[in-house]
Amino acid sequence: MATANFGKIQIGIYVEIKRSDGRIHQAMVTSLNEDNESVTVEWIENGDTKGKEIDLESIFSLNPDLVPDEEIEPSPETPPPPASSAKVNKIVKNRRTVASIKNDPPPRDNRVVGSARARPSQFPEQSSSAQQNGSVSDISPVQAAKKEFGPPSRRKSNCVKEVEKLQEKREKRRLQQQELREKRAQDVDATNPNYEIMCMIRDFRGSLDYRPLTTADPIDEHRICVCVRKRPLNKKETQMKDLDVITIPSKDVVMVHEPKQKVDLTRYLENQTFRFDYAFDDSAPNEMVYRFTARPLVETIFERGMATCFAYGQTGSGKTHTMGGDFSGKNQDCSKGIYALAARDVFLMLKKPNYKKLELQVYATFFEIYSGKVFDLLNRKTKLRVLEDGKQQVQVVGLQEREVKCVEDVLKLIDIGNSCRTSGQTSANAHSSRSHAVFQIILRRKGKLHGKFSLIDLAGNERGADTSSADRQTRLEGAEINKSLLALKECIRALGRNKPHTPFRASKLTQVLRDSFIGENSRTCMIATISPGMASCENTLNTLRYANRVKEFGISPSDIPFSQGSGSRPDLSPSYEYDDFSPSVTRVKELTVDPTAAGDVRPIMHHPPNQIDDLETQWGVGSSPQRDDLKLLCEQNEEEVSPQLFTFHEAVSQMVEMEEQVVEDHRAVFQESIRWLEDEKALLEMTEEVDYDVDSYATQLEAILEQKIDILTELRDKVKSFRAALQEEEQASKQINPKRPRAL
């Protein structure tokens, strides 16, 4: 086989090649293939090295300057050309002769004339000469090469090459965008109105490097531990085609993809990032949540401490599931809740030698706080009174403590309490817990308190969304829930900062848990449960902001685990928008009262004279510790509590205090009425005697009637004032402004 003539082609030089899609670009020659007269070339495209095999004819057609030199000279086997051919060849070698034959003016540049003018005149002359001689094949080798490979082209300048590169990149980018649009069109779910948001969230998650919390991670010691738990989408949300807008990329980071819309109706995502001590995704079981949250607190109560663990979140976000146990339909498996898991570890700790010698006894209580009132769930929901003794210790009068010997006893008490807990229907849940349930495990040594573990399942944290136009009872539920949650937050903040005063009297919940917020050996854990659905996005953000206020964390871009290939943020197409991650997104401003802004705060705390002020004067309760703590609470949360909302809370607190006094006075009058009946019965029996003392009868009857009139008149006046307070509460509820948007 004859050896292929590669001309000026050498390994390592760059040649122009033509791709199958018509693109022309440079590539480096890597090998010369003599067996099939081809060359192998390679080039770099999108960071990848690509190559192909191209025949010599294609190479020479695009690179005529690489044509072999011997093809230009006449071959020895070729017979001498006729005269006409020789004349043509002579013209080719001496271009000026051609110009003089045509009698054209002498050109200034022979190359330009020869290439632009002489060449077109040669081929018709050659064609006519060949026809006259009767031979078409008698063509010079130079003309044969030109006919085969076309006229030689000039070398491209760097500017032209750069323009061609830009054009190539533009075409490539358009091709990629077209492929992306076609791919999106295939993925479009016409039945889902939020498929754009779904694609944005999916693409964003693809840029993250997931490092979720595992059981192998260490457990850190915290005096105040704040964690977040995400539940999976439920059946109702799945049927409604709701989207999961919560992402937990690492063990302490929670991201909320909040859908937004511009003025031009373009939809985009606003990503808000929060950091906590722990973050549990929707695959974490109750046992794992308990391991990092409540389990470290069990040892605290054996060391004469007070421990508190509470679940906080929107209705239906999984609070009762976390604290009470797994649900199977309407049935609850109490053995898998934090209540039972904590009790199990308590009994295991009792068997340890260093605690066994203490001879500790375990007791349990279970009560609920509903609309500011306390009810014993283990004693047929008996209403209880919360009082302070002379040592300023809070006592829940009448609360039953039941001794428990094993975990089974605890499970029975939990079943009894859950069966009679107050619930109601809200927009988020058909069976919603509307009360705070408090389950306490108490250790006593020889009758004296040794330690207490309070496990609280809080009511839903909806800020009046379901109570704006409801009846009084539901309205009071929402008011008490919101007030108690604000008070709980401030009490925990005071515990973490060792503040001298804790506003625990602002609500019944914090008043009952007072001993858990005071003392150096007090520890608290908060489990914020969140719903993943897009429909619950606002309530989810409220929950996360509340948790962030309890224990303020900072967040930086380095805390977000982006994958290595994506850099600090993913590549975004023009239809995507993501906010930069900055600490200002999630750092919630600490609310303190600025002394220089007292004029701004004064209208919130002082109101024009109204019926409440008149009632304060009459009842003498205007400066009670409860109302002082309520004022302090509202001052510390002035951005969340508007003047109208404070007036409403003030009216509700006043009404609740008056209600308790009216009921207490009514009970006292009833007991006194029994004594009056006995006295009146004795007087009537005296009149049946023949010679009874009429003066004594009249005197005693008059005394009884005067006493009755005085007591009943006082009770009637209080009832009238109580009715006025009810009207004042109703008027205040109508003046509450909608919740102001939070500026981050």
Curated annotation (Swiss-Prot):
Subcellular location: Cytoplasm; Cytoplasm, Cytoskeleton, Microtubule organizing center, Centrosome; Cytoplasm, Cytoskeleton, Spindle pole; Cytoplasm, Cytoskeleton, Spindle
Region described as Disordered: 66-186
Stored Pfam families: KIF2A-like_1st, Kinesin
Residues given in the record as ATP binding sites: 313-320
GO biological process: cell differentiation; cell division; microtubule depolymerization; microtubule-based movement; mitotic spindle assembly; mitotic spindle organization; nervous system development; regulation of cell migration
Kinesin motor domain span: 223-553
Subunit structure: Interacts with AURKA and PLK1. Interacts with PSRC1. Interacts with MCRS1; the interaction enhances recruitment of KIF2A to the minus ends of spindle microtubules which promotes chromosome alignment.
Protein name, entry field: Kinesin-like protein KIF2A
Bias (Basic and acidic residues) ranges: 159-186
PANTHER family tied to this protein: KINESIN-LIKE PROTEIN, KINESIN-RELATED PROTEIN 6
GO annotations of cellular component type: centriolar subdistal appendage; centriole; centrosome; ciliary basal body; cytosol; mitotic spindle; nuclear body; nucleolus
Protein family according to the UniProt entry: Belongs to the TRAFAC class myosin-kinesin ATPase superfamily. Kinesin family. MCAK/KIF2 subfamily.
Organism phylogeny: Eukaryota, Metazoa, Chordata, Craniata, Vertebrata
Phosphoserine modified-residue sites: 75, 100, 135, 140
Gene Ontology molecular function: ATP binding; microtubule binding; microtubule motor activity
Sequence positions bearing Phosphothreonine: 78, 97
Keywords carried by this UniProt record: Acetylation, ATP-binding, Cell cycle, Cell division, Coiled coil, Cytoplasm, Cytoskeleton, Developmental protein, Differentiation, Microtubule, Mitosis, Motor protein, Neurogenesis, Nucleotide-binding, Phosphoprotein
UniProt cross-references to Gene3D superfamilies, sorted A to Z: Kinesin motor domain
